[in-house]
Amino acid sequence: MATVPTRSGSPRQLTTKQTGDAWEVQARRWLEGKGLRFIAANVNERGGEIDLIMREGRTTVFVEVRYRRSALYGGAAASVTRSKQHKLLQTARLWLARHNGSFDTVDCRFDVVAFTGNEVEWIKDAFNDHS
């Protein structure tokens, strides 16, 4: 778990949620630097959450953000399992429906931004609704 210095100078532990939120902010900034436009963060629908929703041109990009301290056990990108992909697809389907869209009517893709140690990997179109 990550630590952060406090005003008293002694470090305190970050919760898993705080660590995840911090990496999601990093991913958002990094993607904005690559030209994507922010739409939403931490979108919750029945059964799942999407970390970031961005736009690249006319494409809606659903982004899963992952962080691992090291590549031991496969690193961050390897942690997006089939089960997680299924949840992301279902959540995106519900979000699109709430915004009068569907996979048939909206150009979209699923990306993974994986931070492993100090390295960042952007996997465009990491999976799709046909996976």
UniProtKB/Swiss-Prot annotation:
Pfam families assigned: UPF0102
Region: Disordered, residue numbers: 1-20
Extent of Polar residues compositional bias: 1-19
GO molecular function: nucleic acid binding
InterPro entries, A to Z: Restrct_endonuc-II-like, tRNA_endonuc-like_dom_sf, UPF0102_YraN-like
Cross-referenced SUPFAM superfamilies: Restriction endonuclease-like
Family the entry assigns: Belongs to the UPF0102 family.
PANTHER family: UPF0102 PROTEIN YRAN
Name under which the protein is recorded: UPF0102 protein YraN
